[in-house]
Curated annotation (Swiss-Prot):
It is found in: Cytoplasm. Its EC number is 5.6.1.7. The lineage of its organism: Bacteria, Bacillati, Actinomycetota, Actinomycetes, Mycobacteriales. It comes from Rhodococcus hoagii (Corynebacterium equii). It comes from the Bacteria. Forms a cylinder of 14 subunits composed of two heptameric rings stacked back-to-back. Interacts with the co-chaperonin GroES. It catalyses: ATP + H2O + a folded polypeptide = ADP + phosphate + an unfolded polypeptide. This is Chaperonin GroEL.
Amino acid sequence: MAKIIAFDEEARRGLERGLNSLADAVKVTLGPKGRNVVLEKKWGAPTITNDGVSIAKEIELEDPYEKIGAELVKEVAKKTDDVAGDGTTTATVLAQALVREGLRNVAAGANPLGLKRGIEKAVEAVTAKLLDTAKEVETKEQIAATAGISAGDSTIGELIAEAMDKVGKEGVITVEESNSFGLQLELTEGMRFDKGYISLYFATDAERQEAVLEDPYILLVSSKISTVKDLLPLLEKVIQAGKPLLIIAEDVEGEALSTLVVNKIRGTFKSVAVKAPGFGDRRKAQLADIAILTGGEVVSEEVGLSLETAGIELLGRARKVVVTKDETTIVEGAGDADAIAGRVNQIRAEIEASDSDYDREKLQERLAKLAGGVAVIKAGAATEVELKERKHRIEDAVRNAKAAVEEGIVAGGGVALLQSSPVLDDLKLEGDEATGANIVKVALEAPLKQIAFNAGLEPGVVAEKVRNLPAGSGLNAATGEYEDLLAAGINDPVKVTRSALQNAASIAALFLTTEAVVADKPEKAAAPMGDPTGGMGGMDF
């Protein structure tokens, strides 16, 4: 495909126009009095949202240079969302301010590379200041306040705080759509995975269609079990011990399955067979997780273990196992605490190293099953449009709360950024680097000014007043009052604020140092087709 190329000021201004188009659509949502944006969908009802990254993803511009500019800012929003789960609008507003001030200085003759170095040093200093002033999240109320601000609803904040209190910071909190109105919280005790019994005959409670095994042995096998002779030596040892048996294998079929079922029906021996969760390598990993949790070993030819020679010492233990047709829950596995902690650290390292959102999500689920628990928030609403918007808000708020627990909180409402700017006066920079630091200083005011503007206040007046207030005090845009924001429960996770600034500065530096833009040449629209009837009017068909 043919390309078009723009240089110097033309290239940078084209990118800036794209950035501004996207940022102007996103920034109207900032703050407690921010508005919503309606997004048209090709299929189904339109989406109404105030989430920066969702809005950014939908924007496609026609001009090739503007399109590239918008794509670069989308990257800011997406990266911030990936790292912190919130702060996408703040990141976009900061990027716009940094680029606007930066391009003004480049046009006036400043060296872009000098500005870039100055911006990087200034951002490093502000980040250190934010981390230094962050307050640890110690109470349920602080988590509720942080999540409530993100979701724009204190009830959601309280529910998320309740969920985090129950499952711990390593636990997984998922959000599901509900057919009923309002919000519900469901908690899972122990490790649960989405595979149920292979045969209904294993159920111990016919009415509830579930099998409950008290103090069972747990056999983990990485392959299929089809012949009973493989299983018999081990079954005899378990029967002698007088305990029930849970078998988790790739599959249990044929005479092995029928033998287990017949013994269960006759009351000779209580057992349940379940297929192992996941597929391929993920199945192996999950079996290993269950083995560590229950203190057993996975019987696998890869490690030289076979069913015929397996002894009772290879079996795991748990206080209780509950199996339904759809899922299995293992309560209080008898695994060694140090081994479980080691496995948790290993999974955590894999999460850090992974660059796939899907893999990270699956690893996080495994981590929760081992270290914490799983809470499900069920959200309902009157219409599908409202339901999707509400679900999205809750998901963002959950990630926001987790970020707060991780690195602490700072004053919200753009105040922490503005009140961190004096640290830049201590930097001993000269020339274009000093100008770069000043660009950051100006940009740090942008989020607060936008929040004030969205609340119908005069941005410049608000920024000047907040600058002279004690640290942590600022504008409560919801009420229009100036107060101690942390005491009032208006806070942001420092991880969100820090990520927004770092990602915005990264993209702004790329904008300023760009000297040429190569884009696809827009294709001309095809000429309309002629009249298939050849212009012969008046004919009946």
